[in-house]
Amino acid sequence: MLILETVPLLRREVRRWRQEGKRIALVPTMGNLHDGHMALVNEAHARADVVIVSVFVNPMQFDRPDDLARYPRTLQEDCEQLNRHGVDLVFAPAAEEIYPQGVSQQTYVDVPALSSILEGASRPGHFRGVATIVSKLFNLVQPDLACFGEKDYQQLQLIRKLVADMGYGTEIVGVPIVRGEDGLALSSRNGYLDSDERRLAPRLYNIMMQLASQLENGERDLEALLEQTASRLRQAGFCPDELFIRDADTLGDVNVDTRTAIVLMAAWLGQARLIDNVRIAFNADA
């Protein structure tokens, strides 16, 4: 497995594989890898000849400097895990390699329709940072496909729109959420939980599924349902951050044409901001 830190070396290897007619998959990550990331790698292996994983804690997508500073950096362990999973190349650049003139001087990419709604409304600049780094990686690697987790659902939809709008020839593959046996979605930020919080954390999933069940049973007073769910979260020890019921395809409000809805949740538990989502049939009989 190759571990590269510079753009010229990355391009050299990509050029070689292209000349050999290889199909290339990219898995962008910020490191601190877990089984959810390995599911992305496995999906990439199933669809391509060569798997490239980027490990880059992207400063442009952090809206809080303290969050950026404390984000776990575990490159050695990440590379060992990726090597065991047969990854061909790890691209682990420094911030100066990606943003040589600094973040403030970097040309950026924005997807206005999806960057400022939902999670983007409370995290200004976050999705601009995501769109910019993904665009740069796509330009460097020109992958045939790229794998992203469905846990970050708004991010996944934003990247799909980015690819469609900009004419990238990259297939975007969404990979289902990987959960622990207790239902908690795997996340690098789960490491912020202490032992008591970790025991409590699966309640987020349980409460989300309770809301999903109410929707599937035909309850349609969405405002009341969201208030009930927020109350359940608070009673369980969470601090609700974001809670939405949206059309799964457009991320707009559900309406008579919605066939699949999605519940999007974010809540704080101690120092960890936990996110989750579930899609449900909506207006199935319409």
UniProtKB/Swiss-Prot annotation:
Beta-alanine binds at residue 61. Pathway: Cofactor biosynthesis; (R)-pantothenate biosynthesis; (R)-pantothenate from (R)-pantoate and beta-alanine: step 1/1. Coiled coil: none annotated. Its EC number is 6.3.2.1. One of its GO terms (cellular component) is cytosol. GO terms for biological process: pantothenate biosynthetic process. (R)-pantoate binds at residues 61, 155. SUPFAM superfamilies: Nucleotidylyl transferase. GO terms for molecular function: ATP binding; pantoate-beta-alanine ligase activity. It comes from the Bacteria. The active site is at residue 37. It catalyses: (R)-pantoate + beta-alanine + ATP = (R)-pantothenate + AMP + diphosphate + H(+). InterPro entries: Pantoate_ligase, Pantoate_ligase_C, Rossmann-like_a/b/a_fold. Keywords: ATP-binding, Cytoplasm, Ligase, Nucleotide-binding, Pantothenate biosynthesis. Belongs to the pantothenate synthetase family. Homodimer. Catalyzes the condensation of pantoate with beta-alanine in an ATP-dependent reaction via a pantoyl-adenylate intermediate. This is Pantothenate synthetase.
